[in-house]
Structure formats: structure tokens, C-alpha cells
Amino acid sequence: MLKTRTAPWRNLFAMMALATGLSAGPAAAAEFVMKFGTATINETQHQFIKMYKEALEKATNGRIEVQIYPASQLGPIPREIEGVQLGSIQGYIGPVDFYVGLDPRYGVFSAPMLFRDDANVAATIHDPAIQAIILGMAAPKRMVGIATLTLGTAAYAAKSAMLRLDDFKGKKLRINGTALERAKMSRLGATGIAMPLSEVAPGLSQGTIDGTISGLSVFVGFKMNNLVRTITVTNDTFLVSLAVVSQAWLDKLPPDLRKAVIDVGQEVQPKAQAWEVDFTKQLADDWVKLGGQVHMLPADDLARMKTLLESVGDEVTKDQPAVHELLLKVREAAKRH
């Protein structure tokens, strides 16, 4: 049953890759090939890699060829990150939540009620002091952070619509897997099930999960309208993405190319972030065109949610000094911007 359901998705992604030339072999002039993966498709992370490819190949005069692998073509998210550490995959971009196994401080960004809106998130993570921390945390894990991006609000959707706050109770909702997410789900009366993006559609089909927390772009990009119809927006949490490259691979490059790989990440970051702002504006309409609806919780439910969730960050991190310290730094930066 699982094989039958998932095969069309794989075929679709393969056809998309072929249609856009993503799986083409390295150009004759390229001295090095950089496989750059992500779990998503046709959204900001995918767009970042496209922009990065164009800029890096130009900056290196074609000495490095960037190959683009969206939609988990290089494996589930944990395997992609592991591949970057080992050097078998040269680049990856994904939500910081998935890096918590390497450094629990990455989980700070999933604290509810931390940011006001998407613009506040962008200003905070691009604050020089905060960005230096985010990028620097990857270094001890044989990865080099090259860019951070926002991906919009983390929205909720389930097979049975969640129109009121009480509708969360009893549901098994897919999360990225941080302790803060689990605590948030518990406060709402739900259960958080950690799961990489590539397993969400099968999980919904088979009943392993009742719903998922994802960006609007995921629901639209993967055309999940055949699995869920109503997306519930609360703006309690926002998604932050981190692009990393392999230190093992960088060590094999001459100094000039090594510098270009890192510098181009910072060059592309503001361009991709600007693209994200425009892209996000159309997502709700795109979902409606697919036959879905976007629902905002009523004001009284949003107020109750804030009361339930605003202490989660401090409560979960209080016994982890390094994690709590970063939470306080991010919170202060968010207030400042």
C-alpha cells in the first residue's frame, strides 16, 4: 500500500527535475560538483538553491557546478544533514528545528510567542549577533552555515478541520521534533509526532498522524489538498531555515573557491528573503485555488492560546543554561527589531 501511494510522488519529482535540468551531469569545465538538497519544492528554500547555483557558478567561472535536489531526492532530512557532515552531500537547506540533534540550541526558534510576525523574524535572525550564533553553531558538527531565511508562519492542518482551539485536543500532529514543539502540543491537548517532511503524506493517508504543522508553501507545493482542506493560521510560531555546506568538502577546495562558496551564501540571502516576502503573499490564494480554505482562529481562541503557550519557552529551557541563554538573546533581539 505504501509503495503504491508514494511512487507517483517520486515520479512527479523526477519529472520536475528532468524538466528543469536539475539532474543533468556536471558540465565539462566544472572541477567540482556541489549537490545541494532540500526537502521542499517550488518555494523559498528551493529558490535559494536556484539563486545560489547561478551566483556561485558565475563567481567561480564554472569551476563549481551546483546540482539542485529538491523534494528529499537525496533522502529524508536526517540523512541529508548526515550526508553534509560526511561530505557525500555538499549543501543542504532546511528548518533549524531539524538540527536540534546536533545542537539543542537550534530548538529555540520553535518557541511559541517569540516573534510578532514574519518581518520581525527576518529582522531578528539577520541581526548580526544572532546570525553569527546561528551560523556558528554548525561549525563543531563539520558544517559551515552560509545563510538564514524565514519561511513564514507554521500553520496547522488536519483531516478534520481545526476551527476552534478545542479542536486541537486529542489530535496527533506531525512536528519537526523539538522539545518546545512537543511541549506546545501538550499544552494544546494534542500529541506531537516527529516526522520528516517526506513521510507526511503517507502518514496522513495511513492514519499515523491526524495532521501536520507546516508552512503554507508545503501544503501548496506538495498539493496536499487531497489529504487536508482547511489550514488553520495562529501565528504563534514562525519557521526559520538554515543553509549549510560540508566542511569535509570545503577542505578539498582551493582557498579561492572555498571563500566563494561561503561568500555567495551571504550574497544570495537578502535576495532570497525578498523573494520569500512576495511569494508568501500569494500562498493563501494558491491554496484556495486548489480547493482549500485558510482559517484564522477566532480572537478569543487566539488570546487563550497565547496564555497557554507564552511560558513554554522558559519552562522547557530552564534546566538547559546554554539553550535558555540563547532564548533570552533571541527574545531581546526580537523586541529590539
Residue ranges and their predicted role:
Residues 2-14:
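Bacterial N-terminal signal peptides that target proteins for export
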Residues 2, 30-121, 129-337:
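N-terminal secretory/targeting leader peptides
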Residues 13-18, 22:
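Hydrophobic helical h-region of N-terminal Sec-dependent signal peptides
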Residues 4-7, 21, 61:
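N-terminal compositionally biased, intrinsically disordered segments and leader/signal-like regions
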Residues 23-29:
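Sec/Tat signal peptide C-region and signal peptidase I cleavage site
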